[in-house]
């Protein structure tokens, strides 16, 4: 089995359905003896260019290990899901388990926002 990194972009109106979509794709991989090495929900982000007159979308990254039949089934699921605006599948040499640079940025932003809310709540 080979290792793949998959990034897909979901319509912003469908953001609340993203956890269910991730679970469905994870189940599809594991049901066919595949492995999930990393799942990252990058959240709603600004896109580099407009897609279907949208400036923002919900980003998700998966690192999986599966066979080509499973990969074809995943790709088919992406193509026929109207909520998925774009998807990219890249073959990698090994399993990636460490947080991606994008996820580290998301974590930094969340930490900064948390620090701001705690300093705003304290009296001067």
Swiss-Prot record:
Highest taxon of the source?
Answer: Bacteria
User: Which protein are we looking at?
Assistant: Small ribosomal subunit protein bS6
Q: Which InterPro entries match?
A: Ribosomal_bS6, Ribosomal_bS6_sf, Ribosomal_S6_plastid/chlpt, Transl_elong_EF1B/ribsomal_bS6
Function text: Binds together with bS18 to 16S ribosomal RNA.
Give the Polar residues compositional bias ranges.
115-124
What one GO molecular function would you report for this record? structural constituent of ribosome
GO CC terms of this entry:
cytosolic small ribosomal subunit
Q: Which GO terms describe its biological process?
A: translation
Q: Where is this region: Disordered?
A: 96-124
Q: Which UniProt keywords apply?
A: Ribonucleoprotein, Ribosomal protein, RNA-binding, rRNA-binding
Family stated for the protein in its record: Belongs to the bacterial ribosomal protein bS6 family.
Organism per entry:
Cupriavidus metallidurans (strain ATCC 43123 / DSM 2839 / NBRC 102507 / CH34)
Disulphide bond pairs: none
Taxonomy, top ranks, is: Bacteria, Pseudomonadati, Pseudomonadota, Betaproteobacteria, Burkholderiales
Q: Which Pfam families match?
A: Ribosomal_S6
Q: What gene, per UniProt, encodes this protein? A: rpsF
**UniProt key word Ribosomal protein:** yes
């Amino acid at each position: 089995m080979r290792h793949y990194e998959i990034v897909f972009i979901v319509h912003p109106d469908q953001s609340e359905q993203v956890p269910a979509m991730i679970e469905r794709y994870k189940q599809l991989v594991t049901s066919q003896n595949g492995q999930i090495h990393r799942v990252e929900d990058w959240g709603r982000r600004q896109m580099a260019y407009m897609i279907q007159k949208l400036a923002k979308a919900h980003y998700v990254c998966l690192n999986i290990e599966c066979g080509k039949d499973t990969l074809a089934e995943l790709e088919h699921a992406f193509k026929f899901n109207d909520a998925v605006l774009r998807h990219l599948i890249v073959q990698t040499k090994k399993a990636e388990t460490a947080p991606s640079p994008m996820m580290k940025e998301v974590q930094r932003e969340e930490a900064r926002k948390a620090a701001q809310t705690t300093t705003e709540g304290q009296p001067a």
